[in-house]
């Protein structure tokens, strides 16, 4: 799998429609969705990771593909968890693998939905900070943190898209 460079919002933009945002971790995947106008991101769910890197698609991929169908999304935005210096670690490979699997499954279903990758450095930290400000601890809010990080990823994409 080649190294993926983050995409730029607005390039090959599919136009109006919902977008799905994913914060891919090794244990969970946070999921967010935009409104139909592509302006506001909201949390949807946290999906437990079941797919092994070299194994067949698991229930996590099934769930995300189903959400893409349910919301009739026009793009899927996957966060690339790069290191602070911009280099790619093993977590980037996990995100790429999830994006590849979702794209393959959607194509198999006859749906052409682009997978976009966005630099997500610091989104989890921002999500934790926002939840802390709301009085939710890290321990009690792990799955909420993943959703909040997915919202940060997607909202950043949507905001940059609006500026173009």
Curated annotation (Swiss-Prot):
Keywords: Cytoplasm, Hydrolase, Nuclease, Ribosome biogenesis. The keyword Nuclease applies. GO terms for molecular function: nuclease activity. InterPro entries: RNaseH-like_sf (IPR012337), YqgF (IPR005227), YqgF/RNaseH-like_dom (IPR006641), YqgF/RNaseH-like_dom_sf (IPR037027). Signal peptide: none annotated. The keyword Ion transport does not apply. Its EC number is 3.1.-.-. It is an enzyme of class 3 (hydrolase). It comes from the Bacteria. GO terms for biological process: rRNA 5'-end processing. It is found in: Cytoplasm. One of its GO terms (cellular component) is cytosol. Could be a nuclease involved in processing of the 5'-end of pre-16S rRNA. HAMAP family: Nuclease_YqgF (MF_00651). Belongs to the YqgF nuclease family. This is Putative pre-16S rRNA nuclease. The lineage of its organism: Bacteria, Bacillati, Actinomycetota, Actinomycetes, Mycobacteriales.
């Amino acid at each position: 799998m080649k190294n993926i460079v983050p995409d730029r919002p607005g390039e090959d933009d599919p136009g109006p429609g919902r977008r799905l945002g994913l914060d891919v971790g090794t244990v969970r995947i946070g999921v967010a969705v935009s409104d139909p106008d592509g302006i506001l991101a909201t949390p949807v769910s946290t999906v437990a990771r079941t797919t092994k890197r070299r194994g067949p698609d698991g229930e996590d991929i099934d769930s995300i593909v189903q959400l893409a169908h349910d919301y009739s999304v026009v793009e899927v935005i996957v966060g690339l968890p790069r290191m602070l210096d911009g280099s790619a670690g093993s977590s980037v490979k996990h995100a790429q693998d999830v994006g590849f699997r979702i794209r393959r499954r959607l194509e198999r279903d006859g749906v052409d939905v682009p997978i976009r990758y966005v630099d997500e450095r610091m989104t989890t930290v921002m999500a934790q900070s926002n939840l802390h400000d709301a009085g939710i601890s890290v321990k009690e809010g792990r799955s909420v943190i993943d959703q909040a990080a997915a919202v940060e990823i997607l909202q950043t994409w949507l905001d940059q898209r609006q500026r173009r």
